[in-house]
A protein has these predicted regions:
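N-terminal Rossmann-like NAD(P)+-binding subdomain of aldehyde/semialdehyde dehydrogenases
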Residues: 1-100
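Rossmann-like NAD(P) dinucleotide-binding subdomain of oxidoreductase/dehydrogenase enzymes
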Residues: 92-228, 351
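ALDH superfamily catalytic-core signature
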Residues: 192-331, 394, 455-456, 462-464
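Residues at or immediately preceding the N-termini of alpha-helices
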Residues: 4, 23, 42, 226, ...
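Conserved C-terminal structural/oligomerization subdomain of aldehyde/semialdehyde dehydrogenase
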Residues: 21-22, 314, 321-465
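Short, well-ordered beta-strand elements within core beta-sheets of diverse protein domains
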Residues: 13-19, 111, 218-220, 250-255, ...
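Residue-level signal for inorganic ion chemistry
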Residues: 26, 72, 133, 164, ...
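Structural signal for hydrophobic packing residues in well-ordered secondary-structure cores
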Residues: 15, 34-37, 41, 53, ...
Length: 465
């Protein structure tokens, strides 16, 4: 705790130095981070992620390293323009003055990152925080210790402690950090823990970004290309072993295409991972025994609540392995239809009318993502207008996260605030309003004493301006 307090004090004192840094100085720090992730420590990160939960090297490159590099490149290209004051209109009554908005750093920031994409969801927000001119303390997840250790090396090699520091450890470290008056907290994790983080932040009135989760519905109607829908959903669901906050969480399939969809889904899953999935080098593992047992409990509950296993259902306890699993026929009481799954199990429900789907989705919390496979513009329009979600992909899954020109985040229970690109820069910035008087102020005419003439001028101003 002493080290944490000392670093927090040092960063608090250093925040104005970083806050006044130029775009080129911030870009220099981003270049150093990019080089470390892309080149110097790339192999170390690949090996660490494989040790933590057998993440395939290609998936590490595609879902961990590339997104960070892509984010940094976008920031470097646009940062100078983002930092410029934004001129805005000034009402006529304030003639003789100008108005503008400046982006100032929030100050000392805390990033609490998760285990499912530890590199991506640590260094992505860090890039935004650096771009905005903040000092940062990072608390990575203890569930991926090998990766956390490599990230600690990177932070120590690239930054001074008063600029960026990383503290490894369990929940007690996070609790110690949350007791401090950070200016901003960026948390990625579950809604349950998100509420704890927000409660701690409220004690200091710290602003928060909460990237949470939820049950992301995936709709397929009869007009969709069934084969393509099955392929893209299987890919999005089983990527990272289903441990993705925006993974398809449950399927809503139009009744008439159920059997055709299941056949196509099984075909593509086998193509991705072969007949013997447990031996595939492209299929990862559940992060630890606790989460493995949680998922097995879901499978046991499904059997008691009408579930029919259409595919998979196999597991190897010694490896934290669960095969890609598709389940249909569940009753409303099944936990798979209530809890965010965060694993390679996908429940399937059918519908006859799109209105049923909309009502079902709206009966729950707003999801982090919603996926719709349809060729009908009217259906697409109807679903978009009558549901709420943090993000949506139409005729694809998961890909919306990878576009750094789009804001990424949830809505209410699935999150507060946005990340990526300009939106991430703004999230770590305070939009400071400035009015600059440079000549006579018309407002002086309306200052006390309030004479009859000033009353008429006030009425005239209200009417016309």
């Amino acid at each position: 705790m002493k080290d944490i307090q000392e670093i927090f004090k040092a960063q608090s004192q250093h925040q104005y130095t970083l806050g006044n840094s130029s775009a080129s100085q911030r870009i220099s720090r981003l270049n150093a981070l990019q080089k470390a992730v892309e080149k110097t420590y790339r192999k170390d990160l690949q090996e660490a992620l494989f040790k933590d939960f057998k993440k395939p090297v290609i998936e590490t490159d595609l879902t961990e390293i590339h997104p960070v590099i892509s984010e940094i490149k976008l920031i470097k290209k646009q940062l100078k323009s983002w930092m410029l004051p934004l001129r805005v209109k000034t009402p006529f009554v304030f003639i003789g003055s100008s108005s503008y908005v400046i982006q100032e750093p929030k100050g000392v920031c805390l990033i609490i990152s998760p285990w499912n994409f530890p590199v991506n969801l640590t260094f992505g927000p860090l890039a935004s925080a650096i771009a905005a001119g903040n000092t940062v303390i990072i608390k990575p997840s203890e569930m991926t210790p090998h990766t956390a250790a490599v990230m600690a090396e990177i932070v120590s090699a690239v930054f001074k402690p008063e600029e960026v520091s990383l503290f490894e450890g369990d929940a007690t470290v996070a609790q110690s950090l949350l007791s401090l008056p950070f200016n901003h907290i960026f948390f990625t994790g579950s809604p349950t823990v998100g509420k704890i983080v927000m409660g701690a932040a409220a004690k200091h009135l710290s602003s928060v970004t909460l990237e949470l989760g939820g049950k992301s519905p995936t709709i397929v109607d009869a007009s969709a290309n069934i084969d393509q829908a099955a392929k893209k959903i299987a890919w999005g669901k089983f990527l990272n072993n289903g441990q993705i906050c925006v993974a398809p969480d449950y399927l809503l399939i139009e009744h008439s295409i159920k059997e055709a969809f299941i056949i196509a889904f099984i075909k593509h899953t086998k193509h991705f991972y072969s007949e013997q999935v447990s031996k595939s080098e492209d299929y990862g593992r559940i992060v630890n025994q606790k989460h493995f047992e949680r998922l097995l409990a879901h499978l046991e509950d499904a059997k008691k609540n009408g579930g029919t296993i259409e595919m998979g259902g196999d597991f190897i306890a010694s490896e934290n392995y669960i095969s890609p699993t598709l389940i249909s026929g569940l009753t409303a009481d099944a936990t798979l239809l209530k809890d965010e799954i965060f694993g390679p199990i996908l429940p399937l429900k059918t519908f006859k009318k799109i209105e049923e789907v909309i009502d079902y989705i709206n009966a729950g919390e707003k999801p982090l993502a919603l996926y719709l496979f349809s060729k009908k513009p009217s259906i697409i329009k109807q679903v978009l207008r009558n549901t709420r979600a943090g993000s949506t992909a139409i005729n694809h899954s998961v890909v919306q996260y990878s576009n750094h020109h789009l804001p990424f985040g949830g809505s209410n229970n699935s999150g507060i605030g946005k990340a990526h690109g300009y939106y991430g820069f703004q999230e770590f910035s305070n939009q400071r309003s400035v009015v600059k008087q440079f000549s006579f102020s018309a407002v002086e005419i309306l200052m006390p004493p309030y004479t009859p003439l000033k009353k008429r001028l006030s009425e005239w101003t209200t009417k016309w301006f």
